[in-house]
Amino acid sequence: MRKPFQFVTAIASALLINSVAALPDRVGDFSLLDSEGDFHQLSRYRHQDALVLMSYDSSCSSIDGALAQFKTMQSAFADQQVSFALINSSLEANIENIRAERARLGADFSLLLDSGQLVSETLSLSKTGELAILDPDRLTIVYRGGIEAAASQVLMDEIQGDVDSTTVMQANGCDIQYPAKRQHTDLVPDYATEIAPIIGEQCASCHREGGIGPFAMDSHLMLQGWSPMIREVLLTKRMPPTQVDPNIGHFSNARYISDSDLQKLVHWIDAGAPKGVAAVDPLTEIQFPDRREWQLGEPDYVITAPKHEVPATGVLDYINVDVDLPFEEDKWVKAVQYIAGDESVLHHLLSYVTAPQEVAEGEAAQGNVATRFLEGYAPGKVDAMTFPENTGVFIPEGHKLSMQFHYTTNGRATSDETILGLYMYDEPPMYENFTQSVSGMFRIPPYEQDYEASARYVFN
């Protein structure tokens, strides 16, 4: 009676093995900025049937011929739901020279900057002029190789939904060098001296017990267990949470992470996230200051916000509340500090000084709006805010504080009762610290892709 069962099991197992083996190679999600600072993420091309990338290096002698073929291929598929882009992973690439290259090419496709080479590594690109045809929905690569008839055929099959494996063909062109990968293959980055310091500097303040991060990065074991997720959010630029172009201006509190540090982290994870030989785990030694202490001493006035119950699950609407202030005279705020009741769920908080009958619209305001914005709270922003010298936020007599709360659930029901400490001037400062909103609410039309919105304000 057991033999038929064993026979059926064997057939089912064989079919399962064959079906798994036939799938295209998964590359996972990733993100890059292009020469104009625009953000490109593979999964955001899911409205397209395919994304075609070609490795590019202007110093390669054969690149012009490959580029001509690439443009021809793009023209052939112009009426299809296919996007084309170049990916520059040259070690000499930087924002200035790829902008110059983009202008010289005059092409209608993007030039992506892969300065850390991690995306090119993930796609296993080895030659300039090499193609990678990607399925943005399944996050797989269906073709890698030269620009030839086979590439066009695979792309046509992908559009029809008929691709069930990855086609790999030989590519001609200049070799792409990966010195960081080679170095880290020979000598894996050390956890204690190289990896843990990056995590401590960039991640641990939020990813700690009781923090807003979904898990604590407080030991090698935790880091190793979450390493696939860490790799993914690094390559998609979700973390560290700095979704701004580092090549335009400078944000003093942005947690930019260097290409070198990214390479160390990703290559360490790819090597299995080894602990090394250090006797002490540096992440277990990190001490955080008491977040419930007043950093500037006892405030002149403490505001206790209404208590909010946060459920274990669900998506919560913003909560807008007004808090009456007891001041019987005008006040000027010199500094402010928030102390979150439960920072593991408080995503952000905004506060405005408003007149008795005024409704603070926050982000819903239309057009240019001038407000007495007091200060905001966001994950990682735990220091007291002292306004610039001789400036302060004005609170006229009889005005109130309008506050907006945004909570994110984390699987555990809790409550939040945040407090604010206000530090006042004894005498009015020379200038009022005023906030000007350049734009308010804008509407994205249904099904609109890559919708752009802009606004301007002229200072008189």
How would you describe each model-predicted region?
Residues 8-18:
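Bacterial N-terminal signal peptides
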Residues 114-177:
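Thiol/selenol-based redox catalytic cores and closely related redox-interacting motifs
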Residues 64-105, 113-122:
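Structural microenvironment flanking redox-active thiols in thiol-disulfide oxidoreductases
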Residues 28, 106-110, 124-132, 152, ...:
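Structural micro-motif
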Residues 168-323, 398-404:
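Aromatic- and Gly/Pro-enriched helix-to-coil junctions and flexible linker segments
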Residues 21-43, 55, 174, 179, ...:
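N-terminal "domain-start" segment that seeds a small globular fold
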Residues 43-64:
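Short active-site neighborhood of thiol/selenol oxidoreductases, capturing the structured segment around
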Residues 241, 246-251, 280-460:
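Beta-strand-centric surfaces of beta-sandwich/beta-rich domains
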